[in-house]
Amino acid sequence: MTLQTYNDLTTAIGNWLQRSDLGALLPNFVQLFEACANRRLRVRQQEATAELTPGNGVVALPSDYLGWRRLTWTGNPRQELGYVEPSWLQAAYPDLPTDIPRVFTIEGGNILTMPLDPGNTALELVYFQQIPSLAANSTNWLMSQHPDLYLFGALTEAQAYTLNAETAALWKARRDELFEEIEKLSNKTRGPGAVRVLSPTP
C-alpha cells in the first residue's frame, strides 16, 4: 500500500505491529514521533517567513517557532540584525535608546530588539517551523517526501510502549539513519557555502 496520508500511516503501523489491540494508541505513536522530529530536524523544508510588527522593541515569536535563521529590519535600507545574549542586550542598552535596530535576542516567547525603533517598522523573521501535525492536516511535507521516517519513527514509539526492547532498538536505529540522511540531503541541496545555520533554538 502507498504511504501518503495519516490514515495510510496508521494502517501501516497496525499492519507492521500485527497487534489489533493497539488501534486506539496509534495516534499517540504518531504524535510522539512528531515531537521527536521537531526536536531533531532543522532542514530547509521547515523554513518559513513571518512579518512581525514590534511594539517598543518586543514582538511575540510565531506559535510554530523552533529556531531562527535570520531577522531583518524592513526599513530603507533593509538591515539584518545580529543575535546577542539577553544579558548582553540589557547591559549594552541600559538607557533604551531609539534608533534603527541592530541587534536582537530571545527571551521566553518574545523577540527583543535594540535600539528601540520609534516607528515600529516590521521585522522579517526567517525561522524553522514545527512539522505540521499529520492528524490535523492528513499529510505534510515530511510524510510526502519521507514516509519511511514517519513509519519507522512511529514504530519505535510503539515498540517502546509494548516493552519490546530488541525490536524498538532495530526501528530506532533505522529512524536515526533516516534523520541523518534527511539532514545531509538538506545541506546538500542548499548548495555550497549555503549550509551555515546561524543559531540553534535559544
Which residue stretches match the model-derived regions?
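Glycine-enriched, solvent-exposed interface loops adjoining structured elements
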Residues: 1-202
